[in-house]
Amino acid sequence: MAEDPQDIADRERIFKRFDLNGDGKISSAELGETLKMLGSVTSEEVQHMMAELDTDGDGFISYEEFEEFARANRGLIKDVAKVF
């Protein structure tokens, strides 16, 4: 089954909003800054999210890692897309 083009566009837009410096990956600082814009988040919560999303353990969330998470959590991504 082909993916919905809107889902792909939403993922790309959301990733770019988190990738503040445009280097193609999301650092824990970028993740924390963007989440704080959405509401209160603790540094522990940011670290927990990084650990969950950074599956290769390099300290960054690549687009591929983000895409894998987004595909597994479509409902959450649709909610986030409404905010962004």
Curated annotation (Swiss-Prot):
Query: Does the entry feature the keyword Lyase, yes or no?
Result: no
InterPro entries cross-referenced by the UniProt entry: EF-hand-dom_pair, EF_Hand_1_Ca_BS, EF_hand_dom, EF_hand_pair_protein_CML-like
The EF-hand domain extends over 6-40, 41-76
Keyword list, A-Z: Allergen, Calcium, Metal-binding, Repeat
Binding-site positions, Ca(2+) 2: D54, D56, D58, E65
The record, for SMART domains, names:
EFh (SM00054)
Q: Which residues form a coiled coil?
A: none
Kindly give the Pfam families that the UniProt entry links to this protein.
Answer: EF-hand_7
State the Gene Ontology terms under molecular function. calcium ion binding; enzyme regulator activity
Instruction: Quote the cellular component terms of the Gene Ontology held in the record.
Output: cytoplasm
CDD domains, per database record: EFh (cd00051)
- Annotated positions binding Ca(2+) 1: D19, N21, D23, K25, E30
Q: Which PANTHER family match?
A: EF-HAND CALCIUM-BINDING DOMAIN CONTAINING PROTEIN
Name by which UniProt lists this protein: Polcalcin Nic t 1
Please name the source species. Nicotiana tabacum
